[in-house]
UniProtKB/Swiss-Prot annotation:
<dbReference type="GO" id="GO:0032543">
    <property type="term" value="P:mitochondrial translation"/>
</dbReference>
<dbReference type="GO" id="GO:0006412">
    <property type="term" value="P:translation"/>
</dbReference>
<dbReference type="GO" id="GO:0005763">
    <property type="term" value="C:mitochondrial small ribosomal subunit"/>
</dbReference>
<dbReference type="InterPro" id="IPR005679">
    <property type="entry name" value="Ribosomal_uS12_bac"/>
</dbReference>
<keyword id="KW-0809">Transit peptide</keyword>
<dbReference type="GO" id="GO:0005743">
    <property type="term" value="C:mitochondrial inner membrane"/>
</dbReference>
<dbReference type="Pfam" id="PF00164">
    <property type="entry name" value="Ribosom_S12_S23"/>
</dbReference>
<dbReference type="GO" id="GO:0005739">
    <property type="term" value="C:mitochondrion"/>
</dbReference>
<comment type="similarity">
    <text>Belongs to the universal ribosomal protein uS12 family.</text>
</comment>
<dbReference type="GO" id="GO:0005840">
    <property type="term" value="C:ribosome"/>
</dbReference>
<dbReference type="InterPro" id="IPR012340">
    <property type="entry name" value="NA-bd_OB-fold"/>
</dbReference>
<comment type="function">
    <text>Component of the mitochondrial ribosome (mitoribosome), a dedicated translation machinery responsible for the synthesis of mitochondrial genome-encoded proteins, including at least some of the essential transmembrane subunits of the mitochondrial respiratory chain. The mitoribosomes are attached to the mitochondrial inner membrane and translation products are cotranslationally integrated into the membrane. uS12m is required for respiratory growth.</text>
</comment>
<feature type="transit peptide" description="Mitochondrion">
    <location>
        <begin position="1"/>
        <end position="20"/>
    </location>
</feature>
<protein>
    <recommendedName>
        <fullName>Small ribosomal subunit protein uS12m</fullName>
    </recommendedName>
</protein>
<comment type="subunit">
    <text>Component of the mitochondrial small ribosomal subunit (mt-SSU). Mature yeast 74S mitochondrial ribosomes consist of a small (37S) and a large (54S) subunit. The 37S small subunit contains a 15S ribosomal RNA (15S mt-rRNA) and 34 different proteins. The 54S large subunit contains a 21S rRNA (21S mt-rRNA) and 46 different proteins. uS12m forms part of the decoding center of the mt-SSU.</text>
</comment>
<keyword id="KW-0496">Mitochondrion</keyword>
<dbReference type="InterPro" id="IPR006032">
    <property type="entry name" value="Ribosomal_uS12"/>
</dbReference>
Length: 153
């Protein structure tokens, strides 16, 4: 009985080594099986803006307006704000463009998209929506900053 037990424990690593060096491959799905939808399930895409609850934008109320400093190689005064969204979450959002009229209790819309050199800021405020006006005298990339088309006269 003892010798049988010892032979089983000694053979297990040998069998594992044989399996590693085996020339036969594992079975793969045929084209018909793939067409039918079998195989490993697709991994779900992880949201980069989880606080928005799968929505493209969320309305929110500004709690406070902040001026933040960026990470090491950059130097600036970046404008951001804390926003309480309609789903109850509180997020930090970057205010793009030059100059803004956001203040406490302003109604703003928040979209996903992080500000790369501000740690913890993973959302952008949408200019030209809600109480936040668009950037004045903006000529290029106006749609990103909520600016109207300048008049020709």
């Amino acid at each position: 009985m003892l010798s049988r037990f010892m032979s089983n424990t000694w053979c297990t690593p040998l069998r594992q080594a044989q399996r590693l060096f085996s020339s036969t491959t594992t079975m793969q799905a045929t084209l018909n099986q793939i067409k039918r939808g079998s195989g490993p399930p697709r991994r779900k895409k992880i949201s980069t803006a989880p606080q928005l609850d799968q929505c493209p934008q969320r309305k929110g109320v500004v709690l406070r307006v902040m001026v933040l400093k960026p990470k090491k190689p950059n130097s600036a005064q970046r404008k951001a704000c804390r926003v309480r969204l309609t789903n109850g979450n509180v997020v930090s959002a970057y205010i793009p463009g030059e100059g803004h009229d956001a203040q406490e209790h302003s109604i703003v819309y928040v979209r996903g998209g992080r500000c790369q050199d501000l740690p913890g800021v993973k959302y952008h405020v949408i200019r030209g929506a809600g109480d936040l006006s668009g950037v004045v005298n903006r000529i290029s990339s106006r749609s990103k900053y909520g600016a109207k088309k300048p008049s020709k006269s």
